[in-house]
């Protein structure tokens, strides 16, 4: 009898504890860089400068493409779409991160967290697909130059970009719904500087291994699928370029593809580290910095530095600005 009462008492205690832990959470706390308190001010200055330069670079590319009619071609429309997507991608993550570097309150509502995650995944997926479409555009231009104007018009380009956004956000909505269908338990500490899906999944009240496996499978499949398509188009491009008789033609073709390949290597290289690294190795917060801050910063620089059309358009714009002032 005494033993039964004793067992009942502890069962009730366990149930009460479980109910407390499974209380519906209204907010998460982003741990972020609070584990590095001595360098937070330095990190704020560095990330803020990179943030401004990223916005400036992408806005210049979008502005030039919009203003200069010579850039109203599929190649630059894809580049402008990528710049717009990366600008939104940066705005989704960096402002909140900068705020948390200076603030003591690092909370984010559950709704805000789900929206941030959805936009982060959707825009990240859109970037991958647009990079793939840019490779396909170069493939058509180099391997099928006579049919290129018929196959890739500005209207087709717009339709492909819209499809990329739709596909990217369809996947992101699916992943976000899978994650937020479960309830979350305390402690509500997200060990990241934004609502990264793997960091949030681990706060689930139930065993999240199955959900984590599905999310990882979807993300890795998306990354590898788009990367394989890019590699395939590049193989055809290289084989075609090597058959071009003139050295000038080869150089022009390689220059056109070099910027795209560089961005692809950086983008997919940094993103793949998140899913291919061993679970217990390294700090997820530091590993996320390259693909959330550095990649969007480097992309406009790489695409603009060796691009003569962009340079000429920029000079014309600056010349027109100076002429108007006079």
UniProtKB/Swiss-Prot annotation:
Residues 1-41, 92-115, 177-213, 275-284 are extracellular. InterPro entries: GPCR_Rhodpsn, GPCR_Rhodpsn_7TM, Olfact_rcpt. Glycans are attached at residues 21, 209. Disulfide bonds join 113-205. GO terms for cellular component: plasma membrane. It is found in: Cell membrane. Keywords: Cell membrane, Disulfide bond, G-protein coupled receptor, Glycoprotein, Membrane, Olfaction, Receptor, Sensory transduction, Transducer, Transmembrane, Transmembrane helix. It comes from the Eukaryota. Its main location: membrane. Residues 63-70, 137-155, 234-253, 306-326 are cytoplasmic. Gene3D superfamilies: Rhodopsin 7-helix transmembrane proteins. It is a multi-pass membrane protein. The chain crosses the membrane at residues 42-62, 71-91, 116-136, 156-176, 214-233, 254-274, 285-305. One of its GO terms (molecular function) is G protein-coupled receptor activity. Pfam families: 7tm_4. Belongs to the G-protein coupled receptor 1 family. Odorant receptor. This is Olfactory receptor 10X1. The lineage of its organism: Eukaryota, Metazoa, Chordata, Craniata, Vertebrata.
């Amino acid at each position: 009898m005494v033993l039964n009462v004793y067992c009942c008492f502890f069962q009730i205690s366990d149930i009460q504890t479980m109910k407390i832990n499974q209380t519906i959470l209204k907010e998460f706390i982003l741990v972020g860089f609070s584990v590095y308190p001595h360098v937070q001010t330095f990190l704020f200055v560095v990330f803020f400068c990179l943030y401004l330069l990223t916005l400036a670079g992408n806005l210049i590319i979008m502005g030039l493409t919009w203003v200069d009619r010579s850039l109203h071609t599929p190649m630059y429309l894809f580049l402008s779409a990528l710049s717009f997507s990366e600008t939104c991608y940066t705005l989704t993550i960096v402002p909140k991160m900068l705020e948390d570097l200076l603030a003591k309150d690092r909370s984010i509502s559950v709704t805000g967290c789900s929206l941030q995650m959805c936009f982060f995944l959707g825009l990240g997926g859109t970037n991958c697909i647009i990079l793939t479409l840019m490779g396909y555009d170069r493939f058509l231009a180099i391997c099928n130059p006579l049919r290129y104007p018929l196959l890739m018009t500005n209207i087709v380009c717009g339709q492909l970009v819209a499809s990329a956004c739709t596909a990217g956000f369809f996947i992101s909505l699916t992943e976000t719904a899978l994650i937020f269908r479960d309830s979350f338990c305390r402690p509500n500490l997200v060990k990241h500087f934004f609502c990264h899906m793997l960091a949030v999944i681990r706060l689930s009240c139930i065993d999240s291994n199955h959900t984590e496996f599905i999310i990882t499978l979807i993300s890795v499949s998306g990354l590898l699928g788009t990367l394989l398509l890019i590699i395939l188009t590049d193989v055809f491009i290289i084989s075609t370029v090597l058959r071009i008789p003139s050295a000038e033609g080869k150089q022009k073709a390689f220059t056109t593809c070099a910027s795209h390949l560089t961005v692809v290597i950086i983008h997919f290289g940094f993103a793949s580290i998140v899913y291919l690294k061993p679970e217990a190795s390294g700090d997820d917060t530091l590993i996320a910095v390259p693909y959330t801050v550095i990649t969007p910063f480097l992309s406009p620089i790489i695409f603009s530095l060796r691009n003569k059309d962009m340079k000429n358009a920029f000079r014309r714009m600056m010349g027109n600005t100076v002429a108007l002032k006079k």
